């Protein structure tokens, strides 16, 4: 018997349910499509970002089919490494899919908010309470509200909402280095926020798992446990991490953001307060993370030029670099002000 062709190339009358995916341009989208195309039980895999008529494709989804909404078209990533997601685009997509039988939507652990009173870890029973001034987290909470609203008239439709932790992989090296989650990022003295790092492969597997088992409800997606500040510093290798007073850190991040430097602003509270999540509920359905926090971070942060230096020398260089960085930011700010004044 000839092997079954890839799902994306199977004819329209192929047997088995169809799966339509929105937001496939990112590394996550590539992984999800690969998993779907490897499933011989699927009839069709529809890439809504590239199909000629996505509205018609959505309208053709039936009770046995699944819609997976990963994010917006394009490769722009949010501050947690997930694809950006516009709630208005999701609303339009849901309205165009009136008969679909199952939905998988990507939210984020950031939707819980980062508060001094957060339990460690956060579970799905914790209400979503993002800081409304941090637009990214507020959008994720709005996404979940839209899914709940859409389901009111569809009690028989299952909807899995996944809330991943910070998500990275080997291709995330540059992104992580510029993010506030790197061990090399500025930290306020005394801050000891725990960290979680989920691998893109494990998130893609969780999405496919939710599709296969037609999960319903909210599920955190994260590795087992989390990393303390000291554990993260150890994993990053011999790096010189500078600790500054909280007011200095806030000013530097604010200035970086105003100058358009990546990673300048990621929601101040998320950098200072705990928002790690428990994965027990998803694990109970049969999903397991393949990689631990430690393995994920090391893959995405292979180390830098300080790796072979002594701790004392690393600290001396780090302090010097931090000072130069502050001076450089001030110089950039002055130059920016002068350019605007001349304009």
Regions found by a protein language model. Give the residues of each.
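Mid/C-terminal beta-alpha module of Rossmann-like enzyme folds, strongest
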Residues: 206-266, 301, 307-315, 337-342
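Conserved Rossmann-fold NAD(P)-dependent oxidoreductase catalytic core, especially the SDR/UDP-sugar
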Residues: 91-135
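Amphipathic terminal alpha-helices
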Residues: 3, 292-343
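NAD(P)H-binding glycine-rich loop region in Rossmannoid oxidoreductase-like domains
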Residues: 51-96, 114
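N-terminal Rossmann NAD(P)H-binding glycine-rich loop of SDR-like oxidoreductase domains
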Residues: 16-38
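NAD(P)-dependent short-chain dehydrogenase/reductase
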Residues: 150-196
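Active-site Tyr-X1-5-Lys
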Residues: 131-160
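Conserved C-terminal active-site "lid" loop/helix of NAD(P)H-dependent oxidoreductases
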Residues: 259-289
């Amino acid at each position: 018997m000839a092997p079954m062709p890839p799902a994306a190339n199977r004819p329209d009358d192929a047997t088995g349910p169809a799966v339509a995916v929105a937001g496939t341009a990112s590394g996550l989208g590539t992984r999800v499509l690969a998993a779907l195309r490897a499933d011989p039980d699927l009839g069709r895999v529809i890439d809504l970002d590239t199909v000629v008529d996505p509205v018609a494709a959505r309208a053709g989804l039936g009770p046995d089919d699944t819609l997976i909404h990963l994010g917006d078209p394009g490769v722009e990533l949010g501050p947690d490494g997930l694809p950006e997601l516009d709630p208005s685009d999701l609303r339009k997509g849901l309205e165009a899919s009136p008969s679909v039988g199952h939905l998988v939507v990507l939210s984020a652990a950031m939707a819980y908010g980062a508060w001094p009173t957060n339990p460690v870890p956060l579970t799905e029973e914790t209400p979503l309470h993002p800081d409304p001034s941090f637009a990214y987290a507020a959008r994720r909470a709005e996404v979940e509200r839209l899914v709940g609203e859409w389901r009111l008239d569809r009690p028989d439709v299952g909807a899995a909402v996944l809330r991943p932790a910070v998500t990275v992989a080997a291709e995330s090296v540059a992104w992580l280095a510029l993010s506030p989650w790197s061990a090399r990022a500025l930290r306020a003295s005394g801050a000891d926020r725990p960290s979680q790092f989920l691998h893109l492969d494990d998130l893609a597997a969780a999405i496919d798992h939710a599709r296969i088992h037609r999960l319903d409800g909210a599920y955190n997606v994260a590795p087992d446990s989390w990393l303390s500040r000291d554990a993260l510093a150890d994993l990053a290798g011999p790096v010189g991490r500078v600790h500054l007073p909280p007011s200095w850190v806030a000013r530097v991040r604010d200035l970086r953001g105003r100058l358009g430097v990546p990673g300048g602003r990621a929601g101040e509270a998320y950098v200072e307060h705990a928002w790690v999540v428990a994965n027990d509920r998803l694990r109970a359905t049969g999903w397991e993370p393949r990689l631990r926090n430690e393995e994920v971070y090391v893959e995405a942060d292979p180390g830098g030029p300080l790796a072979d230096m002594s701790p004392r020398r690393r600290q001396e260089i780090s302090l010097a670099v931090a000072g130069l960085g502050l001076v450089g930011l001030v110089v950039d700010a002055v130059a920016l002000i002068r350019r605007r004044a001349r304009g």
